[in-house]
């Protein structure tokens, strides 16, 4: 296995610290490895920088498109719900919007709509007493107008 003070290749790999200085890796080999790693890290940083620059260039027009789309979505034509506060004196139109029925709806339809909304907004179940009073006011107004017709 060992001949004349030398070490076989298998043992040389195993006991590298016992190798004679001529058989050990040179400093130049170590520098090449570090240089390759440094080059790879540098290329990675450069790639990330170029990708970031490209993303920032694309972001400006993309931001305008996103803003325009958000404005279109929030327009009233896409919403099926009434947006706005309550009027001082409730009108027939506002009452029908609150209950979600037509102003000329019959008593049965008004009552079913009132029941459905009150189940969702009842103060005993965590709903707002103010909203419940407005819902009741809307029901009373529509029922009174349907009696008159």
From Swiss-Prot:
Name the SMART domains for this protein. Answer: DnaJ
Give the sites modified to Phosphoserine: 102
Q: What biological-process GO terms show up in the record?
A: cellular response to starvation; mitochondrial electron transport, NADH to ubiquinone; negative regulation of mitochondrial electron transport, NADH to ubiquinone; negative regulation of protein-containing complex assembly; protein transport; protein-containing complex assembly; regulation of lipid metabolic process
Query: What are the transmembrane regions?
Result: 38-54
Q: Which domain of life is it from?
A: Eukaryota
How does this protein sit in the membrane? Single-pass membrane protein
The answer to whether the entry has keyword Phosphoprotein is yes
> Which stretch is the leader sequence?
none
The knockout outcome noted for this protein's gene is:
No visible phenotype. Mutant animals are viable. Both male and female are fertile and do not exhibit any obvious malformations or behavioral abnormalities. CD8+ T-cell mitochondria are hyperpolarized, compared to their wild-type counterparts. In fasted mutant animals, livers do not exhibit any signs of steatosis, but accumulate glycogen, possibly due to a sustained mitochondrial oxidation that leads to rapid metabolism of lipids, hence minimizing their accumulation in the liver and favoring glycogenesis. During fasting, loss of white fat is also more prominent than in wild type animals.
Please name every pair of cysteines joined by a disulfide bond in this record.
none
One GO cellular component term noted in the UniProt record for this chain: mitochondrial inner membrane
Q: Where is the J domain?
A: 94-149
What ranges are annotated Mitochondrial matrix (topological domains)? 55-149
| Localization | Mitochondrion inner membrane
Which InterPro entries does the entry mention? DnaJ_domain, J_dom_sf
For the Mitochondrial intermembrane compartment, the record's topological domain ranges are 1-37
UniProt keywords, alphabetically: Chaperone, Membrane, Mitochondrion, Mitochondrion inner membrane, Phosphoprotein, Protein transport, Translocation, Transmembrane, Transmembrane helix, Transport
Subunit structure, briefly? Interacts with the TIM23 complex. Directly interacts with PAM16/MAGMAS; this interaction counteracts DNAJC15-dependent stimulation of HSPA9 ATPase activity. Associates with complex I of the mitochondrial electron transfer chain; this interaction may interfere with the formation of supercomplexes that facilitate the transfer of electrons between complexes.
Question: What is the name attached to this protein's record?
Answer: DnaJ homolog subfamily C member 15
Which organism is this protein's natural source?
Mus musculus
């Amino acid at each position: 296995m060992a001949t004349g003070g030398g070490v076989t290749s298998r043992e040389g790999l195993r006991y590298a610290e016992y190798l004679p200085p001529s058989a050990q890796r040179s400093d130049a080999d170590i520098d090449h490895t570090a240089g390759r790693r440094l080059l790879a890290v540098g290329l990675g940083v450069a790639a990330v920088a170029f990708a970031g620059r490209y993303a920032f260039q694309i972001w400006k027009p993309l931001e305008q498109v996103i803003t325009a789309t958000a404005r279109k979505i929030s327009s009233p034509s896409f919403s099926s719900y009434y947006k706005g506060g309550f009027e001082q004196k409730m009108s027939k139109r506002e009452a029908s919007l609150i209950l979600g029925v037509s102003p000329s709806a019959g008593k049965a339809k008004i009552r079913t709509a009132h029941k459905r909304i009150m189940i969702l907004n009842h103060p005993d179940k965590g709903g707002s007493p103010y909203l419940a009073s407005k819902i009741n006011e809307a029901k009373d107004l529509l029922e009174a107008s349907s009696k008159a017709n």
